[in-house]
Swiss-Prot record:
Its main location: secreted. It comes from Cupiennius salei. Expressed by the venom gland. The keyword Secreted applies. GO terms for molecular function: toxin activity. This is Cupiennin-6c. Belongs to the cationic peptide 04 (cupiennin) family. 09 subfamily. It comes from the Eukaryota.
Amino acid sequence: FINTIRLLINKYREWKNKKDS
């Protein structure tokens, strides 16, 4: 469960990075 949350946060950060760029 925690692993999934960490993965989601990682994807969210990547998506945010791409959006900011």
